């Protein structure tokens, strides 16, 4: 079990890393060397903001996609579902689901922005001349907003643990059980010797919310783009430094295995896993979530493009940047170092317990056992925080853009209103966290809801608007011609793929989740409360869409 990379392991690692590196270098070389075209058509519609630079746009899009899941969720899923063999369904999903949907969302976003719409209610109504379109599009505002309500809370943990690492607060807790108590005390799940008040949690949560507010209030080019230009290079440098440090650990004196065995555990293929439908489903789900598809965010960010700004090369570059962070960096840090110190058997148990146990309980124990552990621990959690804040700022953007575009509010008023509602909802998440409130929201908004929305989106684009028109729109001003086979993929393969994923998740997960199977009776009121928040925020968004279009119709009649 503690063997290093086998021949097949090396082959899968080389193929995955090589493909991603070649495509990433190709994309960025095309982006950086491409000369800006003149006379690219309409520059603004209704005075909407724009991206100052192309590289800033790509880094912001990549920052939206690169989040906690790249460094925690991916390695756990890959290690548990066939190792190197997992990359076969993973890359199939990237080819047939991820990249096509990325191009679709970039195209829909740019098309909507040219006509003054920065969110999916307006965008869908342009593609489908039916009143239902704008109400279905409301999910592209409500879902990311619901996600950011709890995502910001998790994000604040990473900031707190970066501080605790740098100051050595948890040093001395040399086993996972003690670190688990430390985490629960910080989260206020329990009172213990480590934390006896809410103050530390609330301080780091307040700092996190303020930083999100600051960058959003500054706008597109002066806020979000600046954050991406600073945050993304720092994140990638930190990730590379940590990956190199892990690879040079060898066999730690205090460990029970080696990093080589960890890489073997991560990459040696178990081909028997490929016969399990669940593995293919997990791979599709990972691609779907890692690229932030079905959230309405890519659409909103792309709406700040000009009419003939490229979306094909930009979309592929965004995807490859995310894959570099996930497969090469994320796949090298957490699992290999866990195997080196805990061995394969215990690492499997850690992986089965979930990504957060790996990130917040196991790795802090390891940082205490390596030279300069405080520095590397602080760097790890700061990396997660940067990944988190670039994503949370993006998640909040659709709600702000909707109020700006459809109600003509000033950005300050829109940001203030959105954050007031967000803070009120986050208070409930924090207060009821130990009763499963966050997990319930995460399933319905952050898992199931996104699959539903993306399925609606691909059907509207490929079948109602039509692939022929969509293909033409996608290539307007394109710096890269998409192979024509993707016409077929967009019309048939991707929609069927999405329907299969949606059907499978409904059968395997959603029904049992709805019936609260396995949940303690004492938790039921809180879980229903989370569902009430989920449904309530969607209904409020639908109402806001109705009010916006009623206002538009009245103005049209009066003119």
Language-model region placement:
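Membrane-interface "cap" regions at the ends of multi-pass membrane proteins
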Residues: 33-72, 101-106, 110-138, 306-310, ...
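Transmembrane helix-boundary motif of multi-pass solute transporters/channels
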Residues: 56-93, 297-299, 305, 314-316, ...
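Inter-helical loop and helix-membrane interface segments of multi-pass membrane transporters/permeases
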Residues: 2, 45-49, 77-81, 111, ...
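Transmembrane alpha-helical segments of multi-pass small-molecule transport proteins
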Residues: 56-57, 61, 137-141, 169-217, ...
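Transmembrane helix-loop junctions in multi-pass membrane proteins
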Residues: 68-77, 84, 212-222, 243-260, ...
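Membrane-embedded translocation segments of transport machinery
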Residues: 47-55, 225-389, 393, 406-408, ...
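C-terminal membrane-solvent junction of multi-pass transporters and transport-like membrane proteins
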Residues: 136-141, 407-419, 444-530, 558-559
